[in-house]
Amino acid sequence: MPDVTVKPLRSKANAVINLMGALGGLISLALIAVLVKEQGSYLPLFAVVSGLMLLGLVIFLALVKEPELNRLREEAERKYNITDDGKDENEGTEKLGRSKLVSMLFLLASVLLWYMAYNAVTSSFSVYAQKIWGIRDGSFSLPLMVAQVAAIVMFIPVGMLASKIGRKKTILIGVALMIFAFGAAFFLGSNLFGVKIDLSEGIFTEPMFYLMAVFFAVCGIGWATINVNSYPMVVEMSKGSTVGKYTGYYYTASMAGQIATPFLSGLIMDEVGMEALFAYAAVFMVLALVTMLFVFHGDSKPVPKKDKLENFDVD
């Protein structure tokens, strides 16, 4: 995406990418609900998903003409006088200035932390939902589907919001929403205030399920808000020649979080119980909020000649 998209439009472009990814995730969750029965085989699910991935690869290879898209990006940058380099004390070199380097490190730390929070929930939720809330068979996918639908609805709007108020402020709003959602979900599974829910008799007959669905919708909105803007913030600090390198930094941080958190959260839940899952996620989101406050670069810049650029025809 950053290779073929001018910098001012990368949040909106990333919103489209995340929208399509969320639609894919929603399809997967629907397949789980349909194909996975109680103590059933996962083979049909894996077969269908593998087939869809191969179909996606064929479409990508056949239809995405990257050199032509890159040429059109360069034409747009020249036409609208968009510079690909940020101005800092080391302009003209590949190294970041000190201020940008500090921002980059804190931003990557934030990426690591919020992936540790979110992936802990998604990787352990099926077990949590069955043991703590009593959800049976593939119905555990329904709360996650609520989050995905909420994210799908919000991907494009949050990309537009970032162009108005900035990526950092938009991300901070998303982190705050996820802290609220994870904290609320923790209380629904902890029985601290006598509100622990039991869905063993069916999810739709329990009024508390609908409250839980609201919290998961808030979580989905928060995650969309973060995801749409975090990657563009990283590559905003790159130059045309270093986009691949900075993309690697971003995915190293995100993958490290996703790899580490199942192990770490599993150790904690083994010691204190499954009820700790959402508390764990909320704590890491709070840490991500703190590190994000120290990020001062990578925000979106005003779009020159906005009305013309946003309608730039690439056909």
Language model features with spans:
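Cytoplasmic membrane-interface "Motif A"-like loop-to-helix N-cap segments
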Residues: K164-A176
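Helix-to-loop junctions at the C-terminal end of transmembrane segments
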Residues: V36, V153-R167, F193, M269
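Glycine-rich segments within core transmembrane alpha-helices of 12-TM secondary carriers
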Residues: S11-V36, Y251-T261
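C-terminal ends and interior cores of transmembrane alpha-helices
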Residues: A176-T205
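Short amphipathic helix-loop junctions that connect adjacent transmembrane helices
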Residues: S123-F140
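Juxtamembrane intracellular "pre-TM" segments in multi-pass secondary transporters
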Residues: E68-A109, K308-D315
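Intracellular juxtamembrane helix-capping segments at the cytosolic ends
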Residues: M1-T5, T225-S238
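A membrane-interface helix-boundary motif in multi-pass transporters
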Residues: V34-G51, L267-M285
